[in-house]
Amino acid sequence: MMEETLDRDGIKCKPGAVELLEDLKKRHITAAVATATDLERTEKYLTLTGIRPYFEKLICATMVEEGKPSPDIYLYACKQLGLSPGQCMAVEDSPNGVLSAYRAGCKVVMVPDQTQPDAELKKCLYACVPSLTEISHLV
């Protein structure tokens, strides 16, 4: 049912996503996706939104042993990019995503979606911003 709705109505990016990705591209900053979604759906969603070309790598939970909040997906993403976790910034919208990136050693920026960070989660954050439009100056 969800797939039919997506095929019919499409899918929209979060506000500021295209502008952020365009800014990163202009600055020659590599972007990757580290998601709990499988590769087929990830490719489909990114293609439908028109942002697939901005990402050098797509890393999905099926490519690693343990999913978020384990650090596996971020450690693997960093390895695929040829970067150390300390050279990477993760943008996350969920507590499990924040914990995953933090445990891997990445700087983590949270853009809360359904869950606001509690005091413990805030300790893991480099920054917490209300929207993707607030990220470019942090990179």
Which residue stretches match the model-derived regions?
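Asp-based, Mg2+/Mn2+-dependent phosphohydrolase catalytic module
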Residues: 22-25, 38-39, 43-139
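Metal-dependent phosphoesterase signature
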Residues: 1-19, 27
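Hydrophobic beta-strand core positions in alpha/beta domains
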Residues: 32-33, 110
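Intrinsically disordered/low-complexity terminal segments and short unstructured peptides
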Residues: 4, 34-36
